[in-house]
Amino acid sequence: MSVEHLTELHGLLAFDFPSPGENPQLPAAETVAWRVATDPYDEDADENFTVAFERFLDTVSASRVRALIIGQWGEAYDNDSGEIVELLVAAKDRLTSLEAVFLGDIIPEQAEISWIEQSDVTPVLNAYPWLREFGVRGGSGLVFPAVTHENLRTLSFETGGLPGEVVRGVGDSQLPALEYLEMWLGVEEYGGDATVADLAPLLAGGRFPALRHLGLQNSEVQDEIAAAVAAAPLVAQLESLDLSMGVLTDAGAEALLAGQPLTHLKWIDLNHHYFSASMAQRLRDALEPSGVEVDLAEPGDEEEDEGEVWRYTAVAE
């Protein structure tokens, strides 16, 4: 799959804050998700991200902005998100209606996902205790120590390699309102060193009582994750489960079928899988009669080299 620009955030359509010299009619501040970005390779651009962000705050009714998408802020290798986090924290008294932030809306044409340099992003959550949705793209340099946040409902990490330290930080966090959690775990080559053991506190249940959707996706150990999920107490409280984008084979599917019932789910996403046709049918036969929507689209492409079979996650570099 390809990583694309966000088209919406928090139920609001994305709108690109215009560059200097452009004067389109702007929508009401609370009606769109504002995307603020700069192009470091545009020789005609005369402002960096800090200047662009200040211009944004001065141009729109900042106190009415509900959703903010942070796009490219500089050259990927040379600029992590630390300065962006500081800008967001400094603006907390102006962005008093902010409910959703996505940090790193950067596509491969700008920088590969593994090139996006992040930082400790939790100061944003601490600065905005009323925030409801927070998403991050890029795992390099990403830090997420355990936090307490009473109102966050959606938390997502899109990476080609999510550090185990981040997974442990999420699992140790106090997020009583969290309903939706999505983590692209990625591959070890790009920093995705999380293990099933790192997921254990999360899967044990009790930490996030409001959680209704769990996505543990894009992993090269997707079979092991499926086996852990199959026995996880947390699953009983879920309405939907996403194990897509990873190297999920018949072994992982067999673990799901042999584990606890999944017939209470509204849907389960297993796309980008490596199932045999017979296993795919077994999954459908086990779940669809109970009304579970089963997504088995986009089978992964195997490659064979000198008798060895290679399987890949959907997103890595």
Could you describe each region identified by the protein language model?
Residues 96, 208-218, 226, 253, ...:
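Long, charged, low-complexity, helical-prone intrinsically disordered regions
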